[in-house]
A protein has these predicted regions:
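Non-transmembrane, aqueous-exposed alpha-helical and coiled segments at domain scale
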Residues: 1-204
Length: 204
């Protein structure tokens, strides 16, 4: 959304602005996060021998947080949100829908395992942080599982996300174009390091 507003502030065309928004949404920390979650889920299904063994799962999730397992990023994908901390209402509803669909598709064991990953992932993350900040599952935690159950390929996960946002992006763009000030959005930067001594190129 912010990317659409920034590009719109330059008075570029709608196509370019929406394309920029899609490019921003595509990142694995945003719209592409549900792909990260479902890939992590498949990895955990292979690594954890007993899907009901809480201790075995906790050990592996802790190794992930310590950058010793899976992709070694120190992340449990789908856990945590910048705004929602106690619960993400979108994730709560998707969790319910995922349960109904899993029952219909005969994938209840996987659903129960995913719920356990959510439960223990939150616990392990809080312990890893020293218990200072609450966390919850976000929108991406169950959406990828739902998409997979209805047969959608990963390549269209992000486009579906973008489709749901196009109306909002368009509203933001219209608002941006109608500001009387016609200002370009640019970052503000304040140097807090003080002056540094310049080293000539040939001395570096």
């Amino acid at each position: 959304t912010f990317t659409v507003r920034v590009t719109s502030s330059t008075r570029t065309d709608t196509y370019s602005s929406i394309a920029a928004g899609i490019g921003s949404l595509k990142g694995p920390l945003h719209g592409g996060a549900n792909i990260k979650v479902i890939n992590m889920f498949h990895h955990l299904k292979e690594q954890i021998r007993d899907w009901k063994n809480v201790k075995e799962l906790d050990v592996y999730l802790t190794r992930m947080l310590n950058k010793e397992a899976y992709d070694k990023t120190g992340l449990i994908y789908g856990i945590g949100h910048a705004v929602y901390t106690l619960s993400d209402p979108r994730a709560v509803e998707l969790k319910r829908l995922a349960g109904e669909l899993a029952k219909e598709k005969g994938r209840e064991d996987e659903y129960e395992f995913l719920k356990l990953i959510e439960q223990e992932g939150i616990k392990c993350l809080q312990e890893h942080r020293g218990g200072s900040k609450p966390a919850c599952a976000n929108l991406d935690f169950y959406s990828g599982f739902i998409y997979e159950m209805i047969g959608l390929p990963q390549e269209i996960y992000t486009p579906i996300f973008a489709m749901a946002r196009i109306v909002g992006w368009t509203a933001h763009r219209i608002e941006e174009l109608n500001f009387e000030g016609r200002r370009i959005i640019r970052p503000a930067y304040k140097n807090i390091l003080g002056e540094l001594e310049y080293t000539p190129l040939d001395e570096r």
